[in-house]
Amino acid sequence: MASNLGSSNYRYQVGGSLPVNAPTYISRAADKLLYQSLLVGEYCYVLNSRQMGKSSLRIQTMNRLRSAGIVCAEIELSGIGSQQITPQQWYGGLIQELVSGFDLDIDLLAWLCDHAHLSPVKCLGEFISTVLLEQIQQRIVIFIDEIDSTLSLSFPADDFFALIRNCYEQRANKPQFRRLTFVLLGVATPSNLIQNKASAIPFNIGQAIDLEGFKLSECAPLIAGLTGFSPHPQAIIEEVLYWTRGRPFLTQKLCRMVANQLQKRSDLDVSVDEEKQLVKTLVKTQIIDHWESQDEPEHLRTIRDRLLYSEQSRALLLLYQQILAGKQLLANNELTQFELRLTGLVSKVGGELVVANPIYHNIFNQAWVDQQLSVQPSPAESVYRTSGVSDLWDRLIEDSN
């Protein structure tokens, strides 16, 4: 969904990946870090909550790398499938994506038949070594998006991640592997992605890329979209960022709402306070009030569902409750903290966990948390329900009647 401002056709895009030439794309510190890391051949991973701009970052970075003479391709794992798919089909799908993405000249069916004696992961490794790196002599970057879809596979993806690490380790003895770099993107914790914790994983050899909210100094493209419709475009964006803390989806959405209102206005003789009040009113009436019915495209419900349908939902709620109450909690790599951050509900600021923005604070407030905890089973009840004791007790009661 997009909003057009007058004849300039300026677009605030809400949801989805922004194209390369999108006028409202905001370049952040992550853009620079990812690009520079890939230029020197570092493996990278971008693990963050949904709608933080991962896919748009990938598109922009691929464009810059191609301009620098680096050959790139992306694999969206969700497109290969994860439900009722065998290892042979999944790894075969990866190979097919490489053939398509790099436009490789190969009779793939014949090649797969010739290598049918290999395990699926070994087959992929052999393809990378003898086909991809042979046909493409330039530097190569493979972006693997939606890496969290591996969690839905009926088989462990440990071998896949071990293969990626092995490609890195082969740089020591095989110079051609120094031309190959991977980028992993998705919504998951490294520990969740790996079932065998003793496995060699790529996350401790790569560069982590953190996606932070937009800062005012980065927002010239957003300000430009309001110029001509308000005498105070920067003040409006400042107020937008106060409410969204620069979260990409919410920021683009609120900018679109403001733009639509400004287009209806004929009088430009307004004060800064009036412009800020307009933003505040839109936040209250079109985002916070009746939020579940107004949440289109879906954003807030995604946060809610990731929090409530997690296996450790109660632990996440209790941790969030402490943050909501203002307790100082130092951010660390503990699993519950990482899971809570992946909901998008909290972020790391100055080394501490805080509620990500005032919109979330108003919607997912203390009353909401109390309500959710009241219907969550206690730890003892969870054990009782999952241990089979409950069913046995119910049958004994039924038999005695």
Regions found by a protein language model. Give the residues of each.
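Conserved catalytic segments around the Walker B and adjacent sensor/switch elements
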Residues: 63-83, 142
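Short, amphipathic alpha-helical interaction segments positioned at domain boundaries
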Residues: 360-384
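Conserved NTP-binding/hydrolysis module of P-loop NTPases
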Residues: 72, 84-108
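Short regulatory helix/loop adjacent to the ATP-binding pocket of P-loop NTPases
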Residues: 174, 189-206
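Walker A/P-loop-proximal flanking segment of P-loop NTPase domains
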Residues: 2-49, 54-65, 130-131, 401
